[in-house]
């Protein structure tokens, strides 16, 4: 079972190599390297710089947890492959902002519906700390700065996503 999101592309060359991977019946699933692009620039660093994601699995060995940003649960051995997926998630900053907002609201709704307990103090502390730490981690420690404007945009907007998740959680727990 090969599955890609609508904004992911597997090259013809990589597609031709899939049967070779499937020959090893001991492996239940494979992680493929995902390379993100923003403004036609390949992101080599930051949060998306070294991303491998399960995109090839035997249908009898996989199930999913969560509806949005689903997490594959694999029964059996998972290995890394050399295959690469190109990921074009955002056409421009406006598209990126809309996506960040939508996913933040979905994530907060998921956490709220799963009945995680979030005391007010925890949400406020995370609101103040987590987005800032995430920016520093992605932009400086993971070298997002080396990706230029695209790296800065990603670091800022993914930190903003972290902020929005907590703002939406605060609204759900304490303002409704």
Task: Cite the ranges covered by each PLM segment.
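Catalytic-site signature of metal-activated, phosphate-bearing donor transferases
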Residues: 2, 11-175
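Catalytic metal- and UDP-sugar-binding loop of GT-A-like glycosyltransferases, i.e.
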Residues: 4-6
